[in-house]
């Protein structure tokens, strides 16, 4: 195929797709460029479907290459290793809008790989990779009902900005990624500084207008170079199996899905499944898979009809009703802050830990090195769903949910000047029945307040579900539980304060959302969020006034940056001496800010005093109470501050003439001295004689 380049203007910059030159054996491949950012995206599919599965086997990988920013990987191996957290989140961004657009009966393995080749800070590669994935799939022979378009949206100086530059992103109150088809929204991912619902909706719809132009542009490319879509073997459930499953299961399934208690409901539905499969005993594995499909479709039909036509939810709640709430704080005595948050069966334990500045997380990826002083980690162990399987490291879903909760709380975390601690939150999902990520947002707020972190406002989260009808009408459901998420059309997670939204994550299973659905979901989420915040503030209404006795105490001082060298001392001698004497941790910033983490107030204040002493300017005429460190025939050396010594000449030790220094002082004595001179080399001359008639209280003044 002849190489072709297609170009369009997007937000004042050139967007281009080069096709037919790279990765020639892939089903679809494109080199996407935006400014100086370049990403190669490929799409490949297996020739045959994977056997024995009832899910779509799509994998998306986002490969960061450090050469794209002119860096060589650190460490001994000097090559890229496992994907970073940012790479995993970017892969999820690519995956979520395209997954619903594959045929439901397509079971071939599909692999989408985005390789970042060059990065321009003004043009983030993740959004470009999303566009590249849409092009690669659309021009390939893989069945795909796209194309999609994607943009980044900012809110700068009261204006909505499409694809903001690096400088604009620094001051933007909104970081919103929207993906969609020509007329509907497929995916939303947002972090915001308490943005009101009306502005958020305007930003989403402004993005949709740009997405429409992108999709029309990609459609033109597909008309020119797109391959015919492959024919594939469709797995269709025969009518006789459908009918038999319906006869065996309909009445019981209708009865069981309405059992309010999740444990009892799941038990009965599992028993029904066993009963149905037993009726097909002796059939092939392929037939049993079709039976499983038929039973799934039957249960889905019942739940959706029950909600849409009868106005009933499985647990009997109203459409806008939240499950029963329960919360408790301070449940773990030795942690710095802890909270248990429960919504229905969903139960999350969140623990807050306060650390020193030196415990921040340093990120060295495609962007400039960044230090994170606030982190949120989310764990989803197998027991939370009653399963027995090995515990592995965090998966993509756990990393994604942790990032969502982190983003939700970030706008209310106090600045380093207000609260000089590193903050780590860990949410342990103890029981899962829908909306665990939003429960972790609520639990995190409570744990921070229990830890005494002066957050700017409490944050709560809620998930809104959706049931669409054949006539185009729809029903939105507040606080969806597992069965509603499983059989519903969307999971629209919204977190925020009373003032506005701080985070959004939208996942859907249908071919997009209209403005009406998004607007209804945003305002329904706000109504629920305010109710949850009211409840949370009955548990703890404001951050505790004191930190846990087990949390480190952090003290802060500022010195002249030129004095940092003296505070550290040759080979770290001086700072290590302070640490050894006071049992503290010390972090020094290049601008002269110094943070001291101590086990108690006495140690912290002592360390600060020693540091300030070293950084202090000594002036002639000042008095100090110092310790004699050594003596010589010509005088005594007195340490007036850690690292600051002066000489009291023998003639300045006493009013009378002395034969020996030892007549008046010896090593270890505390003596009051006066500064009588400082030479050009910084050597300090002291006098005990001139301080003999001065009291210590006068010196303190």
Curated annotation (Swiss-Prot):
InterPro entries according to UniProt: ExoRNase_PH_dom1, ExoRNase_PH_dom2, ExoRNase_PH_dom2_sf, KH_dom, KH_dom_type_1, KH_dom_type_1_sf, NA-bd_OB-fold, PNPase
Domain of life where this protein originates: Bacteria
GO BP term, pick one: mRNA catabolic process
UniProt keyword annotation of Transferase present: yes
Domain S1 motif: 621-689
Protein name, entry field: Polyribonucleotide nucleotidyltransferase
Compartment annotation: Cytoplasm
Stated role: Involved in mRNA degradation. Catalyzes the phosphorolysis of single-stranded polyribonucleotides processively in the 3'- to 5'-direction.
């Amino acid at each position: 195929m002849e190489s072709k380049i297609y170009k369009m203007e997007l937000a004042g910059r050139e967007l281009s797709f080069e096709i037919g030159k790279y990765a020639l054996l892939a089903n679809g491949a494109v080199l996407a460029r935006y400014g100086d950012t370049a990403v190669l995206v490929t799409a490949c599919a297996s020739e045959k479907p994977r056997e024995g599965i009832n899910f779509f086997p799509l994998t998306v990988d986002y490969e960061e290459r450090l050469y794209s920013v002119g860096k060589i990987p650190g460490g001994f191996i000097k090559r890229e290793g496992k994907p970073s957290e940012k790479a995993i989140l970017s892969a999820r961004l690519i995956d979520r809008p395209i997954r619903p657009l594959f045929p439901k009966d397509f079971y071939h393995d599909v692999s989408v790989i985005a390789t970042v080749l060059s990065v321009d800070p003004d043009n983030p590669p993740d959004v470009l990779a999303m566009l590249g994935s849409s092009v690669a799939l659309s021009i390939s022979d893989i069945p795909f009902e796209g194309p999609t378009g994607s943009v980044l949206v900012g809110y700068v100086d009261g204006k909505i900005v499409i694809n903001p530059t690096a400088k604009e992103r620094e001051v933007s109150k909104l970081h919103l990624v929207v993906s969609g088809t020509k007329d509907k929204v497929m995916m939303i991912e947002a972090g915001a500084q308490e943005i009101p619902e009306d502005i958020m909706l305007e930003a989403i719809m402004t993005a949709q207008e740009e997405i429409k132009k992108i999709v029309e542009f990609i459609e033109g490319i597909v008309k020119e170079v797109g391959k015919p879509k492959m024919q594939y073997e469709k797995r269709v459930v025969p009518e006789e199996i459908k009918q038999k499953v319906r006869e065996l299961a309909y009445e019981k399934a209708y009865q069981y899905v309405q059992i309010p208690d999740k444990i009892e409901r799941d038990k009965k539905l599992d028993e029904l499944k066993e009963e149905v499969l037993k009726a097909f005993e002796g059939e092939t594995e392929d037939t049993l898979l079709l039976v499983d499909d038929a039973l799934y479709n039957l249960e889905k039909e019942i739940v959706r009809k029950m909600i849409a036509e009868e106005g009933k939810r499985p647990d009997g709640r109203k459409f806008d009703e939240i499950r029963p709430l329960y919360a408790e704080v301070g449940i773990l005595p030795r942690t710095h802050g802890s909270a248990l948050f429960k919504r229905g069966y969903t139960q999350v334990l969140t623990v807050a830990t306060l650390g020193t500045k030196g415990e921040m997380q340093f990120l060295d990826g495609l962007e400039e090195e960044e230090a994170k002083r606030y982190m949120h980690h989310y764990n989803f162990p197998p027991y939370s769903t009653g399963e027995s399987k090995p515990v592995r490291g965090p998966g993509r879903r756990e990393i994604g949910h942790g990032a969502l909760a982190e983003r939700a709380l970030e706008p209310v975390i106090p600045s380093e000047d207000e609260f000089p601690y590193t903050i780590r939150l860990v949410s342990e999902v103890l029981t899962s029945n829908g909306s665990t990520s939003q429960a972790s947002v609520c639990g995190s707020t409570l744990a921070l307040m229990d830890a005494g972190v002066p957050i700017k406002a409490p944050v709560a989260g809620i998930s809104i579900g959706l049931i669409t009808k054949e006539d185009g009408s729809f029903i939105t459901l507040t606080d969806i539980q597992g069965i509603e998420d499983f059989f519903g059309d969307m999971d629209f997670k919204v977190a925020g304060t009373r003032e506005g939204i701080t985070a959004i994550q939208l996942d859907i299973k249908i071919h997009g959302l209209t403005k009406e659905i998004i607007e209804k979901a945003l305002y329904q989420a706000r109504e629920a969020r305010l109710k949850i915040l009211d409840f949370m503030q009955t548990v703890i209404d404001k951050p505790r006034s004191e930190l846990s006795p087990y949390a480190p105490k952090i003290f802060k001082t500022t010195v002249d940056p030129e004095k940092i060298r003296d505070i550290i001392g040759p080979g770290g001698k001086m700072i290590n001496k302070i640490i050894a004497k006071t049992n503290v941790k010390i972090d020094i910033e290049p601008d002269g800010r110094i943070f001291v983490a101590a086990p108690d107030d006495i140690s912290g204040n002592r360390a600060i005093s020693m540091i300030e002493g070293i950084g202090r300017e000594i002036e002639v005429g000042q008095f100090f109470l110092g310790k004699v460190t050594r003596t010589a025939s010509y005088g005594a050396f007195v340490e007036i501050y850690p690292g600051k010594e002066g000489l009291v000449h023998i003639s300045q030790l006493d009013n009378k003439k002395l034969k020996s220094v030892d007549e008046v002082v010896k090593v270890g004595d505390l003596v009051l001295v006066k500064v009588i001179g400082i030479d050009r080399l910084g050597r300090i001359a002291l006098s005990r004689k001139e301080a003999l008639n001065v009291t210590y209280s006068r010196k303190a003044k």
